[in-house]
């Protein structure tokens, strides 16, 4: 977010580091959470990327985006959409005692290098209501089946719960997803947790950020990116996570 109350950690002091992480790791495609329109525009100064996504408050530009940014030279967008985590998912709304509207952005893409097709979903589950997180997990499973069908897919985001909690258990027990952290062919690099509370000396314990993959996808590596700690500059209050994968 771009929150004045963040003091020294306001977005104006973080945006350069955020863009440096993106360019240094050269992401082909990635999901973002807690992104306001002005922050999205700052990230789009990286001209190699295009985006899909809308604001959760009005389906246009208001409120948090969960955008998907993709490198246009590597990935072709075919079509896209979004849904809300609520009982009325086709319009801006909230249910299940959710603190606020929650949205999922999705797109169908083609990898220009391999000519393979895949879907990508970017979500942010509610941070207050466990009822909302459980029902959001159920809706995500339902929507992925409806939208992606038999094609490979990636689902990213801050799901605000640990791996042993009910929402993640439901998703993984559906048989439609694998947790990339658990199936990486190489040992995951960096801390398991991602939420560091603006503290370089804090060892994050809670793994609440995920890259969930369709079961046929091969995950070659998983990394929690700690460039912030190494350079002494924060880009976010979460460490980013990254995988290398083969379809």
Walk through the language-model features, giving the residues of each.
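Structured beta-strand-rich core segments of catalytic domains in phosphoester-bond hydrolases
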Residues: 29-119, 223-224
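Mobile, glycine- and charge-enriched loop segments
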Residues: 1-9
């Amino acid at each position: 977010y771009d929150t004045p109350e963040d003091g020294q950690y306001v977005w104006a002091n973080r945006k350069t580091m955020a863009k440096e992480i993106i360019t240094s790791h050269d992401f082909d495609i990635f999901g973002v959470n807690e992104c306001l329109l002005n922050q999205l525009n700052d990230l789009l100064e990286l001209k190699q990327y295009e985006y899909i996504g809308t604001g959760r408050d009005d389906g246009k530009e208001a409120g948090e985006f969960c955008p998907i940014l993709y490198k246009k030279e590597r990935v072709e967008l075919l079509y896209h959409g979004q849904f809300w985590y609520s009982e009325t998912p086709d319009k801006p709304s909230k249910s299940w005692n959710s603190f606020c509207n929650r949205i999922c952005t999705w797109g169908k893409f083609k990898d220009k290098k391999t000519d393979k097709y895949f879907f990508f979903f970017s979500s942010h589950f509610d941070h207050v209501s466990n009822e909302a997180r459980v029902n959001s997990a159920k809706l995500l499973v339902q929507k992925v089946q409806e939208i992606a069908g038999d094609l490979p897919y990636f689902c990213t985001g801050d799901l605000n719960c640990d791996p042993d909690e009910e929402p993640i258990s439901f998703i993984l027990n559906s048989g439609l997803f694998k947790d990339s952290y658990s199936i990486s062919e190489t040992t995951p690099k960096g801390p398991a947790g991602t939420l560091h509370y603006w503290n370089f000396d804090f060892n994050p314990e809670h793994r609440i950020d995920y890259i969930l993959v369709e079961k046929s996808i091969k995950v070659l590596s998983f990394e929690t990116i700690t460039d912030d700690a190494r350079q002494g500059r924060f880009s976010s209050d979460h460490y980013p996570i990254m995988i290398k994968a083969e379809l």
